[in-house]
């Protein structure tokens, strides 16, 4: 690429609407790295002959980060939607053989090509909203071959689309049918065979567990965390979504990158997260879709200074959501979060939830130039509009990878 100065823009370099630069410029060298940013009036003369791109006063933020998704899977669960509307609970559907296990059947039956095509269709709307980094979990295979297949597809998405993909092994998502009544034996399989094999194949960036009364116990979760730690892999946790199981305190003991959901999180768990530097990832799409009533303890998280991230939690059963902007709106309207909180929640704090705060979530000299250009009058509009296409352009490594066609 040619060295380029992007100029006449309004810059929000760290995802906070109160920390902005009017009439700003960003200089990006031939490697795609930011070499200078600041007010246009202060642009050094050495950049005078670089290629220019005039953004005509548009807002620029760091590329968005979706830090919790289950993007790769087979089929849908639209039939369960009708059951939920009739009053059947998430837990009851799972006990009937639906829920996660029904998606496991569809995912096992699909080949890599089919999974890639389906996941690519889910990824593209996120890219068109300014997402430049995304986490993708496994967890719908629940055997070595199928988990490998999911993680390989996730890696392929990162190779073939202009987005940084981080993979999370979620083998401990549910109990596969062949292990019915033998949860400890399945944890043996995860710890002794699946996790080591997939780690050796370079398919895992982090390890997650669904710690819940319909998932895995604290003791089983700790076994998976121990296996991950032996491999030098960071951990994260689905925690306190349906009950206060104490998973967050366990996650904090292992210095987890994040604990996610957290509707039933108590103050002791919050204190443990703060001490460990664990990010709280809230998932308002799932809260909305399954009509939860227990709000996450937002005020306590604020009071203790725990960083809060937001994510789509895209999955077929509880959050078939393909919009991080709508997630921001739900964070404001359902969780009573502020605009600065939700914007940092999909930039700086989301990057921290992936352990990648040094690479994503902010625009600084020396970093890769990943940013989104917005056709809005104020940054509050990113969380205000519902369904309006707001992203004009997405730049990754200094190259425009998406441009919205107008007219």
From Swiss-Prot:
Binding residues for Zn(2+): 68, 70, 238, 313
CDD domains: Imidazolone-5PH
Subcellular location(s) of the protein: Cytoplasm
NCBIfam families assigned to the protein according to its UniProt record, in alphabetical order: hutI
Cofactor(s) named in the record: Zn(2+); Fe(3+)
Function: Catalyzes the hydrolytic cleavage of the carbon-nitrogen bond in imidazolone-5-propanoate to yield N-formimidoyl-L-glutamate. It is the third step in the universal histidine degradation pathway.
Catalytic activity: 4-imidazolone-5-propanoate + H2O = N-formimidoyl-L-glutamate
Organism of this sequence: Burkholderia multivorans (strain ATCC 17616 / 249)
Protein transport keyword on record: no
GO process terms (BP): L-histidine catabolic process to glutamate and formamide; L-histidine catabolic process to glutamate and formate
EC numbers: 3.5.2.7
Binding-site positions, N-formimidoyl-L-glutamate: 140, 315, 317
Membership in a protein family: Belongs to the metallo-dependent hydrolases superfamily. HutI family.
MF-aspect GO terms: imidazolonepropionase activity; iron ion binding; zinc ion binding
EC class: hydrolase
Binding residues annotated for Fe(3+), in chain numbering: 68, 70, 238, 313
Cofactor binding summary note: Binds 1 zinc or iron ion per subunit.
Primary localization class, coarse: cytoplasm
Protein name, per record: Imidazolonepropionase
